[in-house]
Amino acid sequence: MTQKSLTFDECKQLSSRIIAMNPNRRANMGQISSHLLDYYTELTKQPWLAQLVGQIRDLTAQQNQMMQEEMKAGETYQQLDRKITDLKKQLPFRSPHYFHFLEDHRAQKFIDPEAFTFQTTVDIDNPEEVEPAVKNALLLNGMFDEPTEKLFREKIFSAEDIELWKGKVLHIERSARNKAHIDIRIPVGMTIAEAQSAFCKLIHATEDPSCVTPERIIFITDAASQIYTADDWYKRLDKEAVAEYREAYRKRGLDIDGRPLDVDSARSGASQ
């Protein structure tokens, strides 16, 4: 699968749906470039990716069985863990937070604030939380119209929460280790961390503070792992919507992508 290399500006001219990713196997984790979202879709259909995801899940299942048998401390478990880590490094990856990084270099000092996606990815890492969290996310999103589902939604969520989060679930996929990634639109005025925290509380999922760094990546899984995709996932917002977000951040003394204006201090402690 090949694609002519496009600049971020060229991508913007061709489509409103753009993704920053590295589509290669065993890719350099510091390199990332802008692509049309259609290229991502084609990538998920590649047999090698499905095979790689399958290998990771098979090894993960073996690990889970060992955990049930209380064999987590053994050498075999650690060997499986190393194999899984190596295989995960072979996966292509995407940026949930930016359409573009300066010089195609994935690091905080190369972030392009103008290319903020106004979305983030919630990582559901606890296996026992995956199914309920996905169900709650779709319910909160307004996906179910049956009377019983509506009543249940109104019972477990407040009217304000339903109004705020309706339509903000953009994408749900199974992760390589058979957990879940839920991509959400960040509500106006919220930062990445605030949006993740608020959403996790509502869907009863454990919040992962390590998942809020601006330059974080998400490993890409195959087409069969995709559960739900909204039409505006990785879609560049119109000028009016962008202006509303930026004004809300400005009133809080934040940069146009919700980061502190003095980002140098934040960079030093953030993971790469």
Regions from the language model: what does each represent?
Residues 106-111, 150, 156-176, 205-209:
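Catalytic micro-motifs at enzyme active sites that drive phosphoryl/nucleotidyl and oxygen chemistry
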Residues 46, 75, 143-144, 162, ...:
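Short aromatic/hydrophobic-glycine micro-motifs
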Residues 72, 175, 255:
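Acidic surface patches and DE-rich sequence motifs
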Residues 93-102, 160-163, 196-200:
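A short linear-motif detector with a strong N-terminal bias
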Residues 164-191, 217-221:
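Histidine-centered divalent-metal-coordination microenvironment in nucleic-acid enzymes
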Residues 10-11, 19-22, 38, 103-132, ...:
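DNA replication initiation modules
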Residues 125-164:
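Short amphipathic alpha-helix segments
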Residues 1-118, 128, 139, 150-151, ...:
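DNA replication initiation on ssDNA origins
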